[in-house]
Amino acid sequence: MKNVTDSFISLGYWPSAESFGFNTDILATNPINLSVVLGVLIFFGKGVLSDLLDNRKQRILKTIQNSEELRGGAIEQLEKARARLRKVEMEADQFRVNGYSEIEREKLNLINSTSKSLEQLENYKNETIRFEQQKAINQVRQQVFQQALQGALGTLNSCLDNELHLRTISANIGMFGTMKEITN
């Protein structure tokens, strides 16, 4: 028991920690623990790092291969464009040799066809305008007819009472009977 008491008493004599911080003294930080941690990181990290580098290498090689293919396609298109340019230049030389009469003829044909197209468009426009005007007129007529019909029905409903209504029905039935006798 005396040893336990002595140990608690000795705790009171320990100097208190002055501050909390990082120990930058390599010799005071356990070099064995650091070497074990570094060894584990190198051992297990080597495979992951080599896989990452291999993947990156493959992507770079694919990118280079794609660039080479695109370069080849661009060179091929450039050659085709140059061939077309040579062909167009030869045709231009032929036009110059033959003179500008062909160009003038084409110009007149283009002007004539354009004027015909404009004329047709004008005719289509006029037909469309006439159609829309007729459509608007028909709509107005229909609305006027509907309003007149509603007005007439309103007038009839306000003027008709039951007795007048029965007399009108009787007169119409009588006219219908007379028409039926005439047709027989």
Swiss-Prot record:
Pfam entry (one): ATP-synt_B
Subunit details: F-type ATPases have 2 components, F(1) - the catalytic core - and F(0) - the membrane proton channel. F(1) has five subunits: alpha(3), beta(3), gamma(1), delta(1), epsilon(1). F(0) has four main subunits: a(1), b(1), b'(1) and c(10-14). The alpha and beta chains form an alternating ring which encloses part of the gamma chain. F(1) is attached to F(0) by a central stalk formed by the gamma and epsilon chains, while a peripheral stalk is formed by the delta, b and b' chains.
Stated name of the protein: ATP synthase subunit b, chloroplastic
Family indicated by similarity: Belongs to the ATPase B chain family.
PANTHER family cross-referenced by the UniProt entry: ATP SYNTHASE SUBUNIT B, CHLOROPLASTIC (PTHR34264:SF3)
Cellular component terms per the entry's GO annotation: chloroplast thylakoid membrane; proton-transporting ATP synthase complex
Keywords for this protein: ATP synthesis, CF(0), Chloroplast, Hydrogen ion transport, Ion transport, Membrane, Plastid, Thylakoid, Transmembrane, Transmembrane helix, Transport
Localization annotation: Plastid, Chloroplast thylakoid membrane
Coiled-coil ranges per UniProt: none
GO MF terms held by the record: proton-transporting ATP synthase activity, rotational mechanism
Miscellaneous comment in the UniProt entry for this protein: In plastids the F-type ATPase is also known as CF(1)CF(0).
Membrane topology of the entry: Single-pass membrane protein
Top-level division of the source organism's lineage: Eukaryota
Leader peptide range in chain numbering: none
Main localization of the protein described in the UniProt heading: plastid
Biological function: F(1)F(0) ATP synthase produces ATP from ADP in the presence of a proton or sodium gradient. F-type ATPases consist of two structural domains, F(1) containing the extramembraneous catalytic core and F(0) containing the membrane proton channel, linked together by a central stalk and a peripheral stalk. During catalysis, ATP synthesis in the catalytic domain of F(1) is coupled via a rotary mechanism of the central stalk subunits to proton translocation. Component of the F(0) channel, it forms part of the peripheral stalk, linking F(1) to F(0).
Entry's transmembrane regions: 27-49
